[in-house]
Amino acid sequence: LDQMERAGAIVGNALVAVKNAAKPGVSLLELNAVAESVIRDAGAIPTFLGYGGFPASICASRNDVVVHGIPTSEEVLEEGDYISIDCGATLNGWVGDSAWSFGIGKDGALQGDELPDDPESSAGGSLRSLDKATQDVLAAGIRAMVPGARLTDVSHALEMATRDAEK
């Protein structure tokens, strides 16, 4: 368990560094380099790099890219973008993997109470709804994780919360 925790901590550190570097004008490939540096400096290897031919250390999905976006130098962050970064690190055979989604710039603050009040703003409306739905689904899954629960119990709670969010 200690090895798993260390791998997860490396991923957490990489995601913090990526979030801190994610500003308007920064390319997704630059964010990839930040994550890879943190991972390698910690003595781990980027899990995604080369897996099934994947060419990067992170998946970077900007705005309407749903999942597993490939970071490029041509794709540059802009004020108000919404980005998801998926990151993995392998340490001594153990894998840490996590994904964070967040907004870019002052109009991109999409974390909890920082969401813009104006639903017509570039970072409001549907992104506000997505952020809330994601938090609600996560909370439902965590509540279902009790001693004796089966994986199907947790997945059922996630499914029901997702269906509620779609209404």
Per-region residue spans from a language model:
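Active-site neighborhoods and metal-handling regions in enzymes and metal-associated proteins
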Residues: 1-167
